[in-house]
Amino acid sequence: MRRSTILIVVLALVFTASVGYLAGAAGSGAGAGSGGHQISTPAFSRVVFLSHVNDPDVIPGFPGDPTFSLKTSFTVAKDGFYLQYVKEGEHTGTHYSAPCHFHTDELCADQMDPGDFILPAVVVDIREQTAADVDYRATVADLEAWVADHGPMPQDAAVLLWTGCDAFWGPDRGPGTVSYYSCGSGKGGFHQPGFSLASVRWLIDQGVLGTRGLLGTDTFGPDPGNDFKYRETSLTLHEHRFTLENLTNLEALPATGAWITWGGPRNAEGSGEPSTVFGLIP
């Protein structure tokens, strides 16, 4: 057996055992948040990254957010060890948003349960619609078509919108240029596809977004670029639900059957955190 194969098997076994332990701890009241439920996961054969590398020369910052920077503070040659100083906002690069990001009476990053960070994944492919309309809003009909093709969506799931906009990841290079800020369309201003408000309500009504769950996307966020009230995000961020933003490599996941897990620092009263996101593929 190749070393890489052994590593994947070991990771899968460790992950499955960890999920069982964490779910049991949450269910017994030992978790940091308000409880949890048992989680049953399949065996996994492959692990993939779903997050971008944070490179200050490449990373596109959301308009108005703190600028990301990396500075070398210590080197092996001079100090005997290497360390960088990181300056960033909580919503830098690939990241998650906690419910308190939009609501003063909801949970923050340090109050979530460990089981909140491990979810079955649903990948909804709207690349064709996005190519025709960069401001496309995924509809209830899109979700129902997914169900017709793949069967019922799991409860408390991570619903990931695959738009293809991550292909244009990079800084803003000025008006009229091909960039992440317009999903490669060359249009001026801010343009990206997202979920329609009706589709988010449908996911909640169906229990796909239940006590747990999230909306994820390979854009700046779940909201269409022309929705400056962020209604889709606001509706999602309640109870133990998240949004995952600036994802990449969604083509590596099957439409159904994979799981995702992610993590970052647990800042006190954090509104979210930059995250490394993993796709776990059966």
Where are these regions (language model features)?
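Active-/binding-site microenvironments in catalytic and ligand-binding cores
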Residues: 2-8, 21-282
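Bacterial N-terminal signal peptides
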Residues: 9-18
